[in-house]
Amino acid sequence: MAEVVGTMAESIQSGLVQATQVARETAVRCAANGLHFAAYGETGQDDADLVRMVQAVPISIAAALTRKAYYFVPLALAEGRGSESAGHRSGNEETMISPVFTAEIAELAICHRNVALGTGGVAGEEGRDGVFLSTRLLGDRFSLAFELFINVGHAFVDETGVPESFSELVWNQAVADVRGETSQDAWESRAQALGGGQNKGHDSRQRIDEKAKTDYLEAAFSDAIAIYLLSLSVDFDYSELREREYPLLAPQALADRLRLVAQLFPPNADYEFSIRYRRRM
């Protein structure tokens, strides 16, 4: 099987372009909110839709991401992903971009790749990082927008940390054993932080794993940012956030997190944040 996949990878290699070359040759645009982005190849996305999606990021969040550029490309993959050594992939693998969609390349592609562009990356600017998003793998607007905003959320938390007000809200929810979480990372780190009721000292008080708590708060904050941005860009139902790996955070708890994020980072002009409840029949 590995030989077949390896042969497939070799057969399509000639149609791929290095991500760094894409960055050098593609004009990067600056949205009205200050976020940098570009489109390359047959993305299958209307330009107006991409602009609307990117512009959903509030100015106050985009201001922290000046070293990021988001590239919408048909398919992104790691060089050698289909080879026998694919199980030992490292961050040093070359990121390759397909300018078109083919079923063969799609089998090897992944949702996004992060690339350190360095001094020769984008418009001569040093130290900018590129995030290459596979638009043709993320076929619908919901999936593509969510993938973009998840990356925005993680990058923002890396730059700024977690506000005290959000940390307090989320930790109080966790201690109160509110049902579910917003991602597998948040779900697992929350359980580790609280120790499943097993981390108790001699005085019967629960011991908190502080490192896991930090990881949990960061994951919960980046998740909340991503879901908030998604709500500004796409109309969706609460149930669409569900995943098999973990129970989704209870609706009221999620609403409380999103309202706080909206207060911290108000929407840009022409965007509106709202939570609508359905009446039970």
Regions found by a protein language model. Give the residues of each.
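Post-HEXXH active-site segment of zinc metalloproteases
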Residues: 142-146, 158-197, 238-246
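Pan-zinc metallopeptidase signature
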Residues: 2-30, 204-281
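Conserved catalytic/binding loops enriched for acidic/polar residues
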Residues: 41
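Active-site scaffold of zinc-dependent metalloenzymes
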Residues: 77-169
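Short, solvent-exposed interaction modules
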Residues: 197-205
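Zn2+-dependent metallopeptidase catalytic core
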Residues: 45-71
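Ligand-binding pocket scaffold of soluble enzyme catalytic domains
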Residues: 25-28, 48-49, 131-137
